[in-house]
Amino acid sequence: MNILKQVDIETEVRLALTEFFEAYNRPLPEEYGLPNVLIEQTGGSSRDQIDTFQVRLSVRAETDEEASDVMRNVLGVLQARAEEQFGALRHVSLNSLANWSTDPVRPDLKLCTALVLITAHRQAVTIPES
């Protein structure tokens, strides 16, 4: 049977960013470098061959300025990767961006969070009959 399945958007985004940033999917490792970006899918919808995902990006850094600067770079890289049609990524748009001041888990770190919508193509796969 031929089907269209959703891509693992967290992995797609991590792969798009890994060349330029230290990027993780949940859970964060106990030991991690700074600055880094955590990628979490928070929702989404499907229509025909296209999926639209809601993704939260969280940048941890030593200062507010660094966290904000890295986040803007992360968003720029994702938009460029979507234009290149990297993997399944097709379009990235920013919903909101906020500096939360400190990371709730590690108060010594600064945190900048963005909510983005990412459009991606579904994958065509064949499921063998059993």
Predicted regions and their residues:
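A short, hydrophobic beta-strand-centered structural micro-motif
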Residues: 32-41
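Charged, amphipathic alpha-helical segments and their flanking helix caps
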Residues: 1-22, 40-130
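Short acidic low-complexity segments
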Residues: 24-31
